[in-house]
Amino acid sequence: MTDGPLIVQSDKTVLLEVDHELAGAARAAIAPFAELERAPEHVHTYRITPLALWNARAAGHDAEQVVDALVSYSRYAVPQPLLVDIVDTMARYGRLQLVKNPAHGLTLVSLDRAVLEEVLRNKKIAPMLGARIDDDTVVVHPSERGRVKQLLLKIGWPAEDLAGYVDGEAHPISLHQEGWQLRDYQRLAADSFWAGGSGVVVLPCGAGKTLVGAAAMAKAGATTLILVTNIVAARQWKRELVARTSLTENEIGEFSGERKEIRPVTISTYQMITRRTKGEYRHLELFDSRDWGLIIYDEVHLLPAPVFRMTADLQSKRRLGLTATLIREDGREGDVFSLIGPKRYDAPWKDIEAQGWIAPAECVEVRVTMTDSERMMYATAEPEERYRICSTVHTKIAVVKSILAKHPDEQTLVIGAYLDQLDELGAELGAPVIQGSTRTSEREALFDAFRRGEVATLVVSKVANFSIDLPEAAVAVQVSGTFGSRQEEAQRLGRILRPKADGGGAIFYSVVARDSLDAEYAAHRQRFLAEQGYGYIIRDADDLLGPAI
């Protein structure tokens, strides 16, 4: 028994004492296999889940390392049944393997005959299986490779996919490392992905996920399809690939509403390929338009359901998912595991910050008090309207102006979800507003002006949550969001984490109406960043800025 920062409980929850001197080391040790559930001020609650354990196993952690981490940092003896359960759960990964058989094609091989018998009796899985070759091997229809993995995960037997990949159409790509080089963690991430064949790389916003993608493309040396969140991100990818690799402008195509170019490297958006015409997903054929050797899913946690369905049919292609967080608010993390692949590499945000590759950040929650009339409007509103009402209270505008006055020389993003609120803020601050309806050309011109320092403040909607490179943004003020979305909170902080030319830090303000749904959702949103070691400082609007009204 030691005076460690963890209390490990038999219900698979792990309590972390935040103020303990070893809290940071303990958090890093349990992060690969435990998920943060609650993060109040002094004690954080994590849960050890099967999916987290299997992701850890696929990323190279074994049960001995997991047990050692818990025992080393636990204040009291770790319940022995829990340790046994961890060993048993992690041993389930890989008990079934998908293997290419030279005579029979795709097969499911069991290292435990009883497990195969259980699978063969499953009414959903059995129709996807073919002839039984021997006691431990059964044929799998190649078209069912993805769906079999999904269903096996659901019954608690995640299969290790060792069936290999088709190389696709060859297209040589090399990195041009003149004046720059891959950082150690970027190289390790690309190597880990390549060794696993398919899977997800998790890196903080601003840590250079695009370069991990470029390194993977160089390893593949094949035609590549890249799927991103929006057209601005697509063009950013193109600029980066032209600058950092042997690819020329003519080798990279854009498949969008404006252009329909299919080239050796083609970049499209999730919105484009899931657009329906007369009820049909016409552009899903992009997946079959070339013999792609690699498919890259940027911001993989946002993968729409139709793309999941198509990805189930693409299991012979190498697939790389890039993201800052594996959290999906729809709970479909298991589908990412099955269809894109398990987590291959994960770097804690604070580790990358300590190396100087992302800026240190301070997170501040500013609590405002609604006026009597605002409180009455909130109290009498229909339930579905209450969050919008408390998120957009007029009281917040004076607070935002005061925050900006505290940072007159810093480039600032004001971020929200409700367009009326953003338009009002834009008018009050004299700042341009970027939202979904803003033309792509105007959007890019404003982002460029912001990068050059010609525009000091931008008011942005959800369109700026993802993949926008604004290195000198040092202050972000969040006024409203998508309910309790943890991944949105992480992405928004990520907008200001690029290292600054002056080596300075960043400040992320979240302006929240107290005693309301706004405050409840804010607490939920902060969970992921708490898991990464970011603490929120709570400030009262009146104390911090003087009376807001």
From Swiss-Prot:
Superkingdom field: Bacteria
Q: Which GO terms describe its molecular function?
A: ATP binding; DNA binding; helicase activity; hydrolase activity
Where is motif DEAH box found? 298-301
SMART domains, per database record: DEXDc, HELICc
Query: What InterPro entries does this protein map onto?
Result: ATP-dep_DNA_Helicase, ERCC3_RAD25_C, Helicase/UvrB_N, Helicase_ATP-bd, Helicase_C-like, P-loop_NTPase, XPB/Ssl2_N
Query: Which stretches make up the Helicase C-terminal domain?
Result: 399-545
Q: Which Pfam families match?
A: ERCC3_RAD25_C (PF16203), Helicase_C_3 (PF13625), ResIII (PF04851)
Q: How is the cofactor bound?
A: ATPase activity has a small preference for Mn(2+) over Mg(2+), Ca(2+) supports ATPase activity less well. Co(2+) and Zn(2+) are inactive. Another study shows equal activity with Mg(2+) and Mn(2+), none with Ca(2+).
According to UniProt, the reaction catalysed is: Couples ATP hydrolysis with the unwinding of duplex DNA by translocating in the 3'-5' direction; ATP + H2O = ADP + phosphate + H(+)
Give me the residues that bind ATP, please: 203-210
State the PROSITE patterns in the record. HELICASE_ATP_BIND_1 (PS51192), HELICASE_CTER (PS51194)
Tell me which GO cellular component terms the UniProt record holds: peptidoglycan-based cell wall; plasma membrane
Entry keywords, A to Z:
ATP-binding, DNA-binding, Helicase, Hydrolase, Isomerase, Magnesium, Manganese, Nucleotide-binding
Ranges for region Required for protein stability or solubility: 1-130
If you read the UniProt record, what top EC class would you report for this enzyme, in one word? isomerase
Names of required cofactors = Mn(2+); Mg(2+)
Which SUPFAM superfamilies does the annotation name? P-loop containing nucleoside triphosphate hydrolases
Q: Which CDD domains match?
A: DEXHc_XPB (cd18029), SF2_C_XPB (cd18789)
Instruction: Using the record's annotation, list all stretches that form the Helicase ATP-binding domain.
Output: 190-344
Effect of changing residue 299 to A: reported as: Loss of ATPase activity
What's the EC number here?
A: 5.6.2.4
Job description of the protein: ATP-dependent 3'-5' DNA helicase, unwinds 3'-overhangs, 3'- flaps, and splayed-arm DNA substrates but not 5'-overhangs, 5'-flap substrates, 3-way junctions or Holliday junctions. Not highly efficient in vitro. Requires ATP hydrolysis for helicase activity; the ATPase activity is DNA-dependent and requires a minimum of 4 single-stranded nucleotides (nt) with 6-10 nt providing all necessary interactions for full processive unwinding. The ATPase prefers ATP over CTP or GTP, is almost inactive with TTP. DNA helicase activity requires ATP or dATP and only acts when the 3'-overhang is >20 nt.
- Record comment regarding domains: Removal of the N-terminus decreases solubility and/or structural integrity of the protein.
Report the sequence similarity comment from the record. Belongs to the helicase family. RAD25/XPB subfamily.
Q: What is this protein called?
A: DNA 3'-5' helicase XPB
